[in-house]
Amino acid sequence: SATSGAANYTSEPDLTVAHICEALGKVSASLDMSHDRLLEAPAHLGVAGIVTQADAQTLARHLPLKRCRISDDQLTSTIGALGDRDGALVGVGTGSFVALKRGDMVRSLGGWGLALGDQGSGAWLGRSALQRCALVADGLAPMSAMIASLLGQFDDDRGQMISFARTATPADYARLAPRIF
């Protein structure tokens, strides 16, 4: 096994490719297998942010793997966690989803991405906290220690907050979530 950085195809496709390639290099080293041999092996990747078959095909074309299937991470996470057993999985990280597995059937809810959902995820919590900061800064909500801490991170500067939000990825928002608790 190997780890690399975040991979969300919807929000950061180029970084997703880079991190998958980095992980492949680490896997070949940990298995004492030639990199070329690893790239010939069949692989199935569950990647956050894969929404359509076209997304999966485009990502596969940008990877060095010769026999690669790609799906969203909900299916692979559910099967990986439950194996052959029936059960439920709540996936909460940068995004969020709930899945139910019964026999060969897997049904999931959520996983819509930050633009439309991901309630309870780190990204959703971080973005919601910044939205609350804006309300407090405008005098429409009361100040709290959490809000003061977040505002302080941006030097109480509206411009810094807006600049951050303009380019923030779900992972950027999720990094704010620990300040909430």
Region annotations inferred by a language model:
Residues T3-Y9, S28-I70, R166:
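Short beta-strand-loop/turn "lid" adjacent to the catalytic site in phosphate-handling enzymes
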Residues S1, G87-R102:
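Gly/Thr-rich phosphate-binding beta-strand-loop-beta motif of the actin/hexokinase/Hsp70
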Residues S108-Q153:
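Glycine-rich phosphate-binding loop plus the immediately following alpha-helix
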Residues L65-V90, D104-M105:
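Conserved phosphate-binding catalytic cores of ATP/NTP-utilizing and phosphoryl-transfer enzymes
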Residues T16-S34, A81:
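Stable alpha-helical structural segments in soluble proteins, enriched in small hydrophobic residues
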Residues S1-A18, K26, V106, G111:
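Short glycine-rich, Thr/Ser-proximal phosphate-binding strand/loop in the N-terminal lobe
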Residues P142-F181:
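A mobile "lid/hinge" subdomain adjacent to the ATP/sugar-phosphate binding pocket shared
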Residues A60-R61, K66, M105-G113:
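Glycine/charged-rich beta-loop-alpha catalytic/anionic-binding loops adjacent to active sites
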